[in-house]
UniProtKB/Swiss-Prot annotation:
Residues 107-234 are annotated as: PH-like. GO terms for cellular component: endosome; focal adhesion. This is Zinc finger FYVE domain-containing protein 21. The gene is Zfyve21. Zn(2+) 2 binds at residues 66, 69, 96, 99.
């Protein structure tokens, strides 16, 4: 892909919605696969009372809409302003207590796990039915739209084409209940092909530092997969 085309795909613009300022992609098709669309606000005439505490709205008790769920609340039930990066808001926005809790948890993904995914890790990669794995660095692209694999060859898999993700684990010690991630089995569609393609990533057995990095990357990918499924189910 030429630098000009890549720049157009990654271009963003600042827009103002009823909920606040958002930095969104120039072209909607090039948005992050982890993103969420803004909700439709419940019309004012349909919510004469707070949808949490049932307080009646009047001149004193003002009505507020949660920017994440779109429901109506009084100030007491919708007072928190929390970052909502999945909707591309520039500043923290007003959210109800339940939504604020979810957004706080997601902030950890953007502050920690996303950085791990962008940095990448080294895996033994097997494509399809191949019996010979290839050592490759797997990372998430800067625009969050592709898994990029670099080794003797170069591959890119669009996150939008991913069908299923299975994290492969093994026990820490015999008989123990705790497990650790050692690999990932991923199925994705290929344009023009009827059957889904398969990719297996396995952490190498060489350097302990490399294994820890791979385990952290797999854990981050597990969290990313949950966000991906939520975005698709919206």
């Amino acid at each position: 892909m030429s630098s000009g085309v890549a720049a157009r795909r990654d271009a963003k613009k600042l827009v103002r919605s009823p909920s606040g300022l958002r930095m969104v992609p120039e072209h909607r098709a090039f948005g992050s696969p982890f993103g969420l669309e803004e909700p439709q606000w419940v019309p004012d005439k349909e919510c004469p009372r707070c949808m949490q505490c049932d307080a009646k709205f009047d001149f004193i008790t003002r009505k507020h809409h949660c920017r994440r769920c779109g429901k109506c609340f009084c100030d007491r039930c919708c007072s928190q302003k929390v970052p909502l990066r999945r909707m591309c808001f520039v500043d923290p926005v007003r959210q109800c207590a339940d939504c604020a809790l979810v957004s706080h948890r997601e902030a950890e993904f953007y502050d920690k796990q996303l950085k791990v995914l962008l940095s990448g890790a080294t895996f033994l990669v097997t494509f399809g039915d191949s019996e010979k794995p290839e050592t490759m660095v797997c990372r998430l692209s800067n625009n969050q739209r592709c898994l990029v694999l670099d080794g003797d060859s170069h591959r890119e898999i669009e996150i939008a084409h991913v069908c299923t993700v299975q994290i492969l684990t093994e026990g820490f010690t015999p008989g123990a209940g705790s497990t650790r991630a050692t690999g990932m089995l991923l199925q994705y569609t290929v344009p023009g092909a009827e059957a889904a393609a398969q990719l297996r990533l396995m952490a190498g057995e060489d350097a302990s530092g490399s294994k820890r990095q791979a385990a952290a990357w797999l854990a981050a990918m597990h969290k990313a997969t949950k966000l991906l499924y939520e975005s698709r189910d919206q």
